[in-house]
């Protein structure tokens, strides 16, 4: 399998009108990657909710909307740039651009316009700090991750994970116009959660990534190395997840909930490591442990932030 990235197709290769004429609302929404932004919006709302001072309902809703639109806009730019590799991978071939339901130029303009609007509206409604973090997160995902890291290094997910970790800081900043230990800890949790989450996916989608020339860790370093990295990053994540407890930002509820979730994640990582493998470390069970770990990681992050919200409510 190749460890080099597939070059971007020349402009115009995928410039085709929608199969049934103009793109429908469904196609425009699909460009925003709704499944991805749902978790982003949740963590952003959590960052806002755990702040000492709650925003007014209108400001809170505008903040959540701007995070949603900003994240979706970055996703649209990502789909525009990745249209060549999306057309190769089974998991992404049905996306609007490679499937011929969306002209590529329209997707790019759509992403850029929504990016600018989300930042301007958030700045006008809240403050410059929140808008600046949102703008940087969009730039980080659209340019640094999508246009550089994704196709150039197996550490793409490790570094690129920062893009999806900013929303808690945005939510907090929109409310407080400042930064503190807790939102930074929330950023670190999401940042360190990203590698084991996506590497679990990449284990069972390895052939797809290799076919597209994306240097994901299993493609470049092999499945066995990836399994060890999942375990290592899971241990680091579980340690960092308890930082809010160590600095006395949370109470017993968060500590207990997170400790139980951490134990579950560690067990998942060990199962991935001990999966039945051939001589090259390729799973003989169709990567069932990795598939379970991927699903568990989603539940983990959701319940951890829920535990944080409940804890902050209980301690006032």
From Swiss-Prot:
Annotated membrane topology: Multi-pass membrane protein
Which key words are in the record?
A: Cell inner membrane, Cell membrane, Heme biosynthesis, Membrane, Transferase, Transmembrane, Transmembrane helix
**EC class of the enzyme, as a word:** transferase
Q: Which domain of life is it from?
A: Bacteria
Give the Pfam families listed for this entry.
Answer: UbiA
Q: What sections of the protein cross the membrane?
A: 28-48, 57-77, 106-126, 129-149, 156-176, 179-199, 230-250, 254-274, 296-316
**InterPro entries per the record?**
Protohaem_IX_farnesylTrfase, UbiA_prenyltransferase, UbiA_prenylTrfase_CS, UbiA_sf
Localization terms from the record? Cell inner membrane
Per its record, the protein catalyses: heme b + (2E,6E)-farnesyl diphosphate + H2O = Fe(II)-heme o + diphosphate
Recorded metabolic or biological pathway in which this protein acts: Porphyrin-containing compound metabolism; heme O biosynthesis; heme O from protoheme: step 1/1
What does the entry list under GO cellular component?
plasma membrane
E.C. designation(s): 2.5.1.141
**Family assignment from sequence similarity:** Belongs to the UbiA prenyltransferase family. Protoheme IX farnesyltransferase subfamily.
Any other comment in the entry?
Carbon 2 of the heme B porphyrin ring is defined according to the Fischer nomenclature.
Q: Which HAMAP family match?
A: CyoE_CtaB
Instruction: Name it.
Output: Protoheme IX farnesyltransferase
Highest lineage ranks of the organism?
Bacteria, Pseudomonadati, Pseudomonadota, Alphaproteobacteria, Acetobacterales
